[in-house]
């Protein structure tokens, strides 16, 4: 009888441990948005950093990118309480140091409209979700930004060439403009202007 009781206690303990383990594995927080990723020597994303500076170790192999490279990404990830990240999808953003507007040739100064879906400053970047109306998935557009250099304020502008494409549905592009190197202080203002479909955009954002 005593032996039977011990076996039952052990069985209950094992079942409880397994149940707790299973419950812990299910505790994940889904996140979709901008993050910074570092690839390893094989091109897999190894570490992600959110816009608050928190680091997450990537727990599974991802799509391959350029090895040993820092990427600004839009990701869909599952984050757990041990700071591990399981990457579901990762899309590189359009991200580069903005050239001075004065060096852009006139042939590239096309301002077809775009739609700003969302915009905010975070992680040291000006992050923008851009909507572009296209005819189909294979439509080819050009989209880039510059920094105006004939002004005493930090102002960016977009150029978009639709090459005469028809407006059928909206396709998204993600942009992260690096803000380091401009000597910005807390509460400085960052400006962005571009042509919109219904009205033009003129944003003033506070650097924090």
Task: Please state what every model-predicted region is.
Residues 1-5:
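Positively charged n-region of N-terminal signal peptides that target proteins for export
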Residues 6-14:
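Sec-dependent N-terminal signal peptides
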Residues 15-19:
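C-terminal motif of bacterial Sec signal peptides marking the signal peptidase cleavage site
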Residues 20-24:
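Bacterial signal peptide processing site
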Residues 29-208:
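First exposed extracellular module after export/assembly in secreted or surface-exposed proteins
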């Amino acid at each position: 009888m005593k032996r039977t009781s011990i076996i039952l206690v052990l069985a209950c303990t094992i079942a409880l441990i397994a149940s707790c383990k299973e419950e812990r594995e299910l505790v994940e927080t889904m996140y979709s948005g901008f993050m910074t990723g570092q690839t390893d020597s094989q091109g897999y994303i190894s570490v992600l950093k959110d816009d608050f500076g928190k680091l997450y170790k990537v727990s599974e192999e991802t799509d391959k990118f350029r090895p040993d490279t820092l990427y600004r990404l839009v990701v869909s990830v599952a984050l757990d309480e041990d700071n591990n990240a399981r990457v579901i999808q990762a899309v590189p953003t359009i991200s580069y140091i903005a050239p001075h507007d004065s060096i852009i040739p006139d042939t590239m100064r096309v301002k077809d409209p775009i739609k700003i879906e969302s915009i905010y400053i975070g992680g040291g970047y000006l992050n923008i979700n851009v909507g572009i109306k296209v005819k189909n998935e294979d439509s080819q557009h050009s989209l880039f930004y510059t920094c105006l250099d004939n002004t005493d304020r930090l102002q960016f502008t977009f150029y978009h060439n639709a090459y005469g494409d028809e407006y059928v549905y909206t396709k998204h592009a993600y942009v992260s403009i690096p803000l380091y190197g401009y000597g910005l202080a807390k509460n400085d203002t960052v400006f962005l202007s571009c042509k919109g479909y219904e009205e033009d955009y003129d944003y003033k954002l506070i650097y924090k």
